[in-house]
Amino acid sequence: CIRDSIHAADEANMAAEYVDILQIPAFLSRQTDLLVAAAKTGKTVNIKKGQFLSPMAMQFAADKVIEAGNKNVMLTERGTTFGYQDLVVDYRGIPEMQSFGYPVVLDVTHSLQQPNQTSGVTGGMPQLIETIAKAGIAVGADGIFIETHENPAVAKSDGANMLKLDLLEGLLTKLVRIRQAIK
């Protein structure tokens, strides 16, 4: 399954030729023209919750996709602004968004971003990836998104909140066990 973000309505059709899921970035999650263009491709539309939105506000974004004729919607929790330089995950939002009838994914690594640091570069807390992922599965997230890299320190983007690739298999094994325990 291939997923990619689109940032403008005129990108939807071209991207749809190559991907299975069109993703709407968090900062664009209220852009009607973008949501409608993505919906009209017929592809699954994954809408990332803006850091500035409540989970309940995501119903309006999902409705725009549905009203455009596409019932293939996913929602992604990716943290909420907490002060000026931090994000937090409010796990209540996962079941709240699931109540709309769509799968909800937890974007673990972006939830651990620390934007607007004094150095001008976004920071992160990768040491909390396992904790946040486990909690997300425990509250019933339908999926987990984790950015990985062999060497996050040299990644071209988001390295400050990535999981080292060699740690992924062990983490996924733990998450599967948690999922099995709660079912």
Feature map (PLM): residue ranges:
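Short, small-residue-biased leader/transition segments that mark boundaries at the very start
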Residues: C1-I2
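Electropositive, surface-exposed helix/loop patches at the edges of structured domains
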Residues: I6-A15, K64-V65, A141-I144, T148-P152, ...
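Glycine-rich anion-binding loops of enzyme active sites
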Residues: I6-T32, A38-A39, F52
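Short Asp/Glu-rich motifs
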Residues: M14-A15, A57, N116, A155-K156
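Hydrophobic side chains in well-ordered alpha-helices
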Residues: A15, A61, I132, L168-L171
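Flexible, active-site-adjacent loop/turn segments at secondary-structure boundaries
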Residues: P25-A26, L87, H110, V154, ...
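Catalytic alpha/beta core domains of metabolic enzymes, predominantly
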Residues: R30-T148
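C-terminal helical cap(s) of enzyme catalytic domains, especially alpha/beta-barrels
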Residues: N151-K183
